[in-house]
């Protein structure tokens, strides 16, 4: 999804202070031309400023002839999500403006990075067949991480929304921009509202994608939000059937442990799957296949759990849980009641970690801004739902709100959203934004659109598993050519049917992948069954040719065709 753009025009707009004046260094990820990366040195705690930390950032200078003086500054959500990798993507959205991507303090590209592999391993251990003993549980693991960070001199009290917002204000001052346009998504929408309130003279406009207002009881609401998202997708009943079935009889699924680099057999209950789905639905491509996926899981197609479990493991391994929990334990968890235990282990796990860490409760900011604000929400978003985002947006004095038929982080999935954001930033005072279709969710897959099977995902991990298909396609092509040259019609038609089958399957898979690559984790195109008759016809014609004339090419082709059909029907279909 990340689009890299390199522009070659000379910079002609008046210069501002460059990032080289704020501790430049090499960029940790690939960047477009004219991008500088660096660190902003700030106090770890502004109320006790002795210890310093470094906040990572990148600045991509626009090369447009009509370059505007006010850049766009972007921060990802999380907490603890990285931002720099989106620099090129954002530069394409705003070609006439500099783009600044700023990391959160304590995240991967800041120093120190508050990684907690102990916590990630304990959370992954939730899926192991044998429950962890208290000494190996989540709270104990989080405490080991906390103690290790303390030994490094890190004070977790300095990692909260208030300090992160102050870092953004300090970066504008350091880079020398008179004004800039704030762009936040998910958690960082809260940060950007705080920045706008703290630095009104430096803010020209604000974009809030998937708005998470401070007033929301996020943990208390999440089970309801997930149920509402399933209802809007039309699979609330199959979802509950799936959860109940797997809670009664948990599935056993082979999963790769990304931290240890080896497979283990996970025990996945319905609540575990609900937790993983709640995270996965933040991706618009997953949302599009969710109706087919949930319905298949409700019917017992547990082999589809492998890609979900692998994705969950990869997500755990890539997250800085020290920062995540430091923020949540100060700014989010204390403002929820937890009167009802959640079905989601991440919700309960965050409460468990915060009970163990005992960080101080933050003071509510109740920030607002008079700057023009554009708020975007996704209809199927279970994380920052319209139910809470839209009223909060309307409470901002100069805000407008748009709903899109997609999920979380609207701008990543919707070209229309990107157009509207760019139009708003170009003229925040305009009362009318160029219209475009907000129905931007990748086309949802109906039951008839997919032949449910886990085989494509298995092949994506081990391409050699597709060898029978490749062998059949090559053998069919050879059979067609040689039989046609020798005037053997039956064998030639058998080869032609095989080539047609292989070509149609390849074309339909490629078309589906271009439409939504994630769909291949759920199955093959629905036309697969129809095309299979061509493979059967190829085998029948080849067998007839063999019966008519027993030659070794016919024998080989018949063996390959028969073996392929056994593989196709018993494993792939």
Language model: regions and residue ranges:
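Secretory targeting and sorting signals
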Residues: 1-18, 40, 168
